[in-house]
Amino acid sequence: MKKTVIALLAWFVSSASLAATPWQKITHPVPGAAQSIGSFANGCIIGADTLPVQSDNYQVMRTDQRRYFGHPDLVMFIQRLSHQAQQRRLGTVLIGDMGMPAGGRFNGGHASHQTGLDVDIFLQLPKTRWSQAQLLRPQALDLVSRDGKHVVPSRWSSDIASLIKLAAQDNDVTRIFVNPAIKQQLCLDAGSDRDWLRKVRPWFQHRAHMHVRLRCPADSLECEDQPLPPPGDGCGAELQSWFEPPKPGTTKPEKKTPPPLPPSCQALLDEHVL
């Protein structure tokens, strides 16, 4: 277990030691009407909002990394979700990475989070608010068994399931990425109310947090949405395929060269950095 916690902690802090990208040199949001530009994994944002770090309903982790910027829709979603969680007495919502002041590529840890429409939220709901020291060096709680086949019963709770369900039922949310074992547990617990499960997508890692993604805002004309998830609750053969051993001869895909930036994002970099 100790090794797992260390590995998760290393994942969250590893980016601090890597070389900065040009986007990290932009220290304040670019003025203008809020516009998410490009795709979630290749884009930027004009007119980002800052998530207030002081709130009765949530706490922001790793504020020293300055990754608490996003489209106004994302800020309002976080405030809305955390308020709903408090109304239901679930606990304090712990907010992880959103995006940088102008979005763009991180130096590590994330391929997406570039257009101000993504946020990581810990799957912990502390009843006692964390100290500043805890927030700066958060201890991720691994909810998944060592073999990756199920959640750890002593760490799973109906409150965590309720938080994920609340997020999935939000009209602005298009996808929520969690570990396959977490998705599997949600499928088992859901009962007859299953429509929201369509948005909850199994993905690698995500053992201690959920990655919430919003749809492109209607007035962000250069924003590229993903196709909708397949119909259904996603609890059948597709989910089970994540638990099958790799086929013989399967190799990890090679790292791809990042595609060219959308012209508007390149122009933003040219004006503010290069």
From Swiss-Prot:
Residues 1-19 form the signal peptide. Zn(2+) 1 binds at H110, H113, D120, H211. One of its GO terms (biological process) is proteolysis. Zn(2+) 2 binds at D147, H150. Pfam families: Peptidase_M74. Keywords: Disulfide bond, Hydrolase, Metal-binding, Metalloprotease, Periplasm, Protease, Signal, Zinc. Binds 2 Zn(2+) ions per subunit. Zn(2+) ion 1 is bound in the active site. Zn(2+) ion 2 is bound at the dimer interface by residues from both subunits. One of its GO terms (cellular component) is outer membrane-bounded periplasmic space. Residues 225-274 are annotated as: Disordered. It is found in: Periplasm. Gene3D superfamilies: 3.30.1380.10. Its cofactor is Zn(2+). The keyword Repeat does not apply. The keyword Oxidoreductase does not apply. Its EC number is 3.4.24.-. GO terms for molecular function: metal ion binding; metalloendopeptidase activity; serine-type endopeptidase activity. Disulfide bonds join C44-C265, C187-C235, C216-C223. Murein endopeptidase that cleaves the D-alanyl-meso-2,6-diamino-pimelyl amide bond that connects peptidoglycan strands. Likely plays a role in the removal of murein from the sacculus. Belongs to the peptidase M74 family. Dimer. This is Penicillin-insensitive murein endopeptidase. It comes from Salmonella paratyphi C (strain RKS4594).
